Amino acid sequence: MAKESTTIDVGEPSTVTKSSSHVVKKKGFVAAAAGGGAKRGLAIFDFLLRLAAIGVTIGAASVMYTAQETLPFFTQFLQFQAGYDDLPAFQYFVIAVAIVASYLVLSLPFSIVTIVRPLAVAPRLILLIFDTLVVTLNTSAAAAAASIVYLAHNGNQSTNWLPICQQFGDFCQNVSTAVVAASIAILFFIVLIIISAIALKRH
């Protein structure tokens, strides 16, 4: 008579299961720490870039606001004057770029929060949205001023607008410098938007 064989399955010890779970959690913590470190680095660069953009935008608005030149002709009673307030495009530039600079100052606390809490989504998302809106304002101001600067340098033969930069050299140099500074600020904003997009993508 054949004997029946009995097979007994012995499960893994609970200590092995707990050990595996501990290893998985540890790897998760290490990955999270590495991701947080990378995001903190992006946040620090974001903060420094905002400081630089503040300086550039304040400089652009100040240079445009103080752009003025007076040319005497024949007598001191007959003078020709050129100033930023003579052209609506330059007035818009000063107001718009001043708003951009104010926004950048107000955005610094949110940038600091992303340094302290690099994994936080809300402040980074807020910065991304408002950076996108403000760079549009900055771009429109720079484009409007750049068109007038071009006319000041080259004129327009079709409308008989003569270039004035040969006479008002200092004025044209100041407004051109302001437009270049505003264009640099646009590049800063593009980098800031890319930083925020990368930080959010890592989530």
From Swiss-Prot:
Any GO MF annotation of the entry: protein homodimerization activity
The processes (GO biological process) annotated in the record are: cell wall modification; cell-cell junction assembly
The cross-references to Pfam families, in alphabetical order and at most eight, read: CASP_dom
Indicate which residues are glycosylated according to the record: 156, 174
Q: What protein family does this chain belong to?
A: Belongs to the Casparian strip membrane proteins (CASP) family.
Q: What stretches pass through the bilayer?
A: 41-61, 93-113, 125-145, 178-198
UniProt entry keywords in alphabetical sequence = Acetylation, Cell membrane, Cell wall biogenesis/degradation, Glycoprotein, Membrane, Transmembrane, Transmembrane helix
Under which name does UniProt file this protein? Casparian strip membrane protein 1
Q: What does this protein do?
A: Regulates membrane-cell wall junctions and localized cell wall deposition. Required for establishment of the Casparian strip membrane domain (CSD) and the subsequent formation of Casparian strips, a cell wall modification of the root endodermis that determines an apoplastic barrier between the intraorganismal apoplasm and the extraorganismal apoplasm and prevents lateral diffusion.
Topology of this chain in the membrane: Multi-pass membrane protein
Classify the source by domain of life. Eukaryota
- Localization in the cell: Cell membrane
Which proteins does it associate with, and in what oligomeric form? Homodimer and heterodimers.
Residue positions where N-acetylalanine is found in the record: 2
Task: Please list the residue ranges that the record places on the Extracellular side of the membrane.
Answer: 62-92, 146-177
Cytoplasmic face: residue ranges?
2-40, 114-124, 199-203
Q: Name one GO cellular component term.
A: Casparian strip
